Amino acid sequence: MRKAKPKKRQILPDPVYGDVRVTKFVNHLMYDGKKNTAFSIFYGALDIVKTKLSNEEKSALEIWKAALDNITPQVEVKSRRIGGATFQVPTEIRPERKESISMKNLILYARKRGGKTMADKLAAEIVDAFNNQGAAFKRKEDMHRMAEANRAFAHFRF
């Protein structure tokens, strides 16, 4: 076992909005250390979101944050082996993991989408998540449904 808990790395806020959550999202979006490319994809997606939802009184960043909140799961199931049987035990998710899961799901399902550029796909997924639909929102609903179905095993603790 390690002697001490490793220190959390400080994440700097992004240059345009000054928001740490944006930088975390871009870090998940980034491939091969190409952060500038990831930033341009993200900002391009927000511009597309702004044009798509121009009648909305919120800014593109607020729409993105609302979309993330809509696809953030509250509970997940973990496998726990007891007496030769494996049970799916519903557990609460800690806040950092909730944020991370929602960001990863948004990016994953944006990548799976059909579309021209990644910015287009990401913008479409953000708009869908904002409107409580799309693949990332469906994933959250599935996670909650699994937890609800296995509520009988909630007394097994980790």
Curated annotation (Swiss-Prot):
GO terms for biological process: translation. The gene is rpsG. InterPro entries: Ribosomal_uS7, Ribosomal_uS7_bac/org-type, Ribosomal_uS7_dom, Ribosomal_uS7_dom_sf. Pfam families: Ribosomal_S7. Gene3D superfamilies: Ribosomal protein S7 domain (1.10.455.10). GO terms for cellular component: small ribosomal subunit. It comes from Porphyromonas gingivalis (strain ATCC 33277 / DSM 20709 / CIP 103683 / JCM 12257 / NCTC 11834 / 2561). SUPFAM superfamilies: Ribosomal protein S7. Part of the 30S ribosomal subunit. Contacts proteins S9 and S11. Keywords: Ribonucleoprotein, Ribosomal protein, RNA-binding, rRNA-binding, tRNA-binding. One of the primary rRNA binding proteins, it binds directly to 16S rRNA where it nucleates assembly of the head domain of the 30S subunit. Is located at the subunit interface close to the decoding center, probably blocks exit of the E-site tRNA. This is Small ribosomal subunit protein uS7. Belongs to the universal ribosomal protein uS7 family. One of its GO terms (molecular function) is structural constituent of ribosome.
